[in-house]
């Protein structure tokens, strides 16, 4: 037979590791939600600043914004 059976006594539980012990407190907050809006406004500001950054990079790439002293091929 190709399948192998394992007796209940031979099965081992999950191994404990140092990294797992360090990360366990982070997982204990799973499922908990802060009341209200939380950090949503901060995320909105970060997204807006990132959009401005991307638009500036795009304008430089398209040579819409000319920079003094920098030659573009």
Curated annotation (Swiss-Prot):
GO molecular function: phosphate ion binding
Gene3D superfamilies xref list: Photosystem II reaction center protein H
UniProt keyword terms in alphabetical order: Chloroplast, Membrane, Phosphoprotein, Photosynthesis, Photosystem II, Plastid, Thylakoid, Transmembrane, Transmembrane helix
Sequence positions bearing Phosphothreonine: 3, 5
Residues that span the membrane, as ranges: 41-61
Segments for region (Disordered): 1-21
Record PTM text: Phosphorylation is a light-dependent reaction catalyzed by a membrane-bound kinase; phosphorylation occurs on Thr residue(s) in the N-terminus of the protein.
Compartments, as annotated in UniProt: Plastid, Chloroplast thylakoid membrane
Cross-referenced Pfam families: PsbH
BP term (GO), one: protein stabilization
Highest rank taxon of the organism: Eukaryota
Topology within the bilayer: Single-pass membrane protein
Primary localisation category: plastid
One Gene Ontology term, aspect cellular component: chloroplast thylakoid membrane
PANTHER family named among the record's database cross-references: PHOTOSYSTEM II REACTION CENTER PROTEIN H
UniProt similarity note: Belongs to the PsbH family.
Subunit structure, as described in the record: PSII is composed of 1 copy each of membrane proteins PsbA, PsbB, PsbC, PsbD, PsbE, PsbF, PsbH, PsbI, PsbJ, PsbK, PsbL, PsbM, PsbT, PsbX, PsbY, PsbZ, Psb30/Ycf12, at least 3 peripheral proteins of the oxygen-evolving complex and a large number of cofactors. It forms dimeric complexes.
Functional description taken from the UniProt entry: One of the components of the core complex of photosystem II (PSII), required for its stability and/or assembly. PSII is a light-driven water:plastoquinone oxidoreductase that uses light energy to abstract electrons from H(2)O, generating O(2) and a proton gradient subsequently used for ATP formation. It consists of a core antenna complex that captures photons, and an electron transfer chain that converts photonic excitation into a charge separation.
UniProt-recorded name of the protein: Photosystem II reaction center protein H
Organism: Lactuca sativa (Garden lettuce)
Lineage summary: Eukaryota, Viridiplantae, Streptophyta, Embryophyta, Tracheophyta
């Amino acid at each position: 037979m190709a399948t192998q059976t394992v007796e209940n006594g031979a099965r081992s539980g999950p191994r404990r590791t140092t990294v797992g012990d360090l990360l366990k407190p982070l997982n204990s907050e799973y499922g908990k939600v802060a009341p209200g809006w939380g950090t949503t406004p901060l995320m909105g500001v970060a997204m807006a600043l990132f959009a401005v950054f991307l638009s500036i990079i795009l304008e430089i790439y398209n040579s819409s914004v000319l920079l003094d002293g920098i030659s573009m091929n």
